[in-house]
């Protein structure tokens, strides 16, 4: 069962196209303060040399349009990530999200192996060490 979501141009993205990659889905919205707090460290994580096999998809589950999300990223000086969209809320339902931010990690075989509920510091050394063992 393929997991799909949209990019900023309304193109459908399928996680199946990223088999063999370490995948991080981060569910967020522009009105969510903790999401705003963690996004810069998530951005840095995408450019971490130890995690060259990592692909991060920040998926907006709010009612925010692409423009609003782009401005949100620009204001936070996000350079390594692009906003994606869960429209209509398929993934939020599929994963039974209870709140945001929620981060879900998938190994190279596409299996979920971890879930972080609430905001986190993605630049934490222990977290990066742990994650790089899946890279």
Go through each PLM region and give its residues.
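Active-site acidic short loop of glycosyltransferases
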Residues: 18-21, 51, 78-80, 97-98
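N-terminal "domain-start" segment that seeds a small globular fold
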Residues: 1-15
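Soluble periplasmic/extracytoplasmic beta-strand elements of cell-envelope proteins
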Residues: 26, 58-60, 115-117
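Short loop/turn microsegments at loop-to-beta-strand junctions
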Residues: 1, 23, 100-101
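Short active-site neighborhood of thiol/selenol oxidoreductases, capturing the structured segment around
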Residues: 14-36
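Thiol/disulfide oxidoreductase modules built on the thioredoxin-like
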Residues: 71-79, 86-132
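Structural microenvironment flanking redox-active thiols in thiol-disulfide oxidoreductases
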Residues: 36-76, 87-94
């Amino acid at each position: 069962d393929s997991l799909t979501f949209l990019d900023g141009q309304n193109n459908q993205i399928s996680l199946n196209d990223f088999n063999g990659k370490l995948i991080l889905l981060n569910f967020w919205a522009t009105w969510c303060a903790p999401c705003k707090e963690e996004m810069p460290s998530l951005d840095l994580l995408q450019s971490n040399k130890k995690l060259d096999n990592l692909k991060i998809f920040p998926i907006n589950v709010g009612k925010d349009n692409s423009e609003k999300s782009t401005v949100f990223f620009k204001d936070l000086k996000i350079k390594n990530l692009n906003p994606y969209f869960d429209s209509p809320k398929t993934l939020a339902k599929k994963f039974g999200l209870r709140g945001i931010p929620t981060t879900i990690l998938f190994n190279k075989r596409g299996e979920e192996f971890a879930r972080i509920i609430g905001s986190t510091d993605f630049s934490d050394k222990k977290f990066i060490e742990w994650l790089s063992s899946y890279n």
